[in-house]
Structure formats: structure tokens, C-alpha cells
A protein has these predicted regions:
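Active-site-adjacent beta->alpha loops and helix N-cap segments on the catalytic face
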Residues: 36-46, 66-71, 85-101, 111-118, ...
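Catalytic cores of alpha/beta
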Residues: 11-19, 69-74, 95, 112-123, ...
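Conserved, mostly hydrophobic/aromatic
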Residues: 28, 84, 119, 171, ...
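Glycine-rich phosphate-binding active-site loops on the catalytic face of alpha/beta enzymes
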Residues: 24, 29-32, 125-136, 175-195
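C-terminal alpha-helical cap/extension of soluble enzyme domains
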Residues: 149-210
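Active-site beta->alpha loop and helix N-cap motifs at the rims of alpha/beta catalytic domains
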Residues: 4, 9-13, 19-21, 27-34, ...
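Catalytic beta/alpha-barrel core
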Residues: 4-6, 59-66, 79-90, 103-117, ...
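Glycine-enriched alpha-helix->loop->beta-strand junction motifs that scaffold or abut catalytic
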Residues: 20-24, 77-82, 98-106, 121-128, ...
Length: 210
């Protein structure tokens, strides 16, 4: 089982860094913008250092701009614990091959089973399908995810774009074991009203004996 925190918000990182639940961080330019961070290599350098300082195993940073190859090289140069996120486009496939380190890449923005097969052919470490966006489209999401599971053996299917804990639990039931979880789901993920009620009863019983 592998969970990655899908957030560029430092408070989210700090919140779960000691839980033992999240092994790594994943980000993209949209998440940086929402966190009011500049999309730049200087920001990436800072995020890389902060992630390692909180004992995350790695951080995934996405290419941007007009020269993906140059940005990807700079991400790799941050250190051995950086992984390059590359959109699953024709240009992205060329980039994975040109970089020559598929084990340090993730194909992201995946919306079809064939992209999983491409990821497997390229030997990338992760392929990230966008579950909620597929659910909201007219595509057959269950067939797509079945195809991803069937085609990816070395490559890990890193399920992204979750809107709710219910979606997360549904995918767990289908056998998925590798997820990016957005910071917006942390409250629902880390607590359950019935558990909280049980704790109150336990504490009340203990207090009555004091």
C-alpha cells in the first residue's frame, strides 16, 4: 500500500508527516498556484528540501514551460529523491525516453487504458490516471481502470483525482493500492464520526472511575 499526499500546502505536509500513512508528496502547477506559490525551479528546490526535512521518501514535481527537457533535468538534479511528473502526451513519451531514467518518472494526466500500456512499455515508475475526472466524463471508467491494472505490471498505477473518501474506498475494494490523496480529503480520511463517538464513551467511562 502506498499513499502520496497531493498537495503543495506546507500545513498539509506537516499534519500527516508523523502519521506513517503517507510515504511521499506529489504536486503540479495547479496545486502550486492554489497554495500561492510561484511555479519555478526555486520553489521546487525549496519544496524538495522541505519534503526531505519531514522524512518523506520522495517528492514528485511536474515539468512546465517551453523546455520540458531542461526543467526535467533540473528536477532530477535536485537530488535522488525527486521524481519527474510528465504529461502523457507524445512530447511526454519522447521526454521519458530522452531522459533515460524512466524509474524516476511518472506519466500524469492519464485518461485511457492504452496510456497504461505505454507507461509499461516505457518502464516508468508510476502512471497517474485521473479517476474523478473520468467518472465525470462519458468514458467507461471501470473498463479503463481494468485495462490499466491488466497492462501495468512493473509500472505502478497511481490513482489520482479523488473527490471523496467514498471514491477512495470504492477503489480499495477493486484492489488498488497506490493513491494520491488531496489535502482537501484529510479531515474525512483521518476521522470517522462513529470512532469519535466511541472514544468519547471510552473517555467518559475512564473518567467515571477517577
Amino acid at each position: 500500500m502506498e499513499w502520496l499526499l497531493d498537495s503543495a500546502t506546507l500545513e498539509d505536509w506537516k499534519r500527516v508527516s508523523g502519521t506513517g500513512l503517507f510515504s511521499a508528496i506529489t504536486t503540479n502547477p495547479l496545486l502550486l498556484a492554489r497554495a500561492e506559490l510561484q511555479v519555478s525551479m526555486q520553489t521546487y528546490k525549496t519544496l524538495y528540501q522541505q519534503a526531505l526535512g519531514m522524512d518523506y521518501e520522495h517528492i514528485q514535481l511536474q515539468v512546465f514551460g517551453d523546455d520540458w527537457f531542461h526543467v526535467a533535468q533540473q528536477i532530477l538534479d535536485l537530488g535522488e529523491y525527486s521524481i519527474v511528473k510528465i504529461p502523457a502526451t507524445e512530447a511526454g513519451f519522447h521526454l521519458v525516453t530522452r531522459l533515460g531514467v524512466p524509474e524516476r518518472t511518472t506519466l500524469t494526466g492519464v485518461y485511457s487504458a492504452r496510456m497504461g500500456a505505454m507507461a509499461e512499455c516505457l518502464g516508468v515508475k508510476y502512471v497517474a490516471p485521473y479517476y474523478a475526472r473520468l467518472v465525470e466524463s462519458e468514458r467507461d471508467v471501470e473498463a479503463i481502470f481494468a485495462g490499466l491494472r491488466a497492462s501495468c505490471k512493473r509500472t505502478r498505477v497511481l490513482v489520482a483525482s479523488l473527490r471523496s473518501v467514498d471514491q477512495f474506498e470504492h477503489l480499495l475494494g477493486l484492489g488498488h493500492r497506490c493513491f494520491t490523496i488531496p489535502g482537501t480529503l484529510l479531515n474525512d480520511l483521518l476521522s470517522d464520526p462513529m470512532t469519535e463517538a466511541a472514544v468519547e464513551q471510552f473517555e467518559a467511562a475512564a473518567a467515571a472511575q477517577i
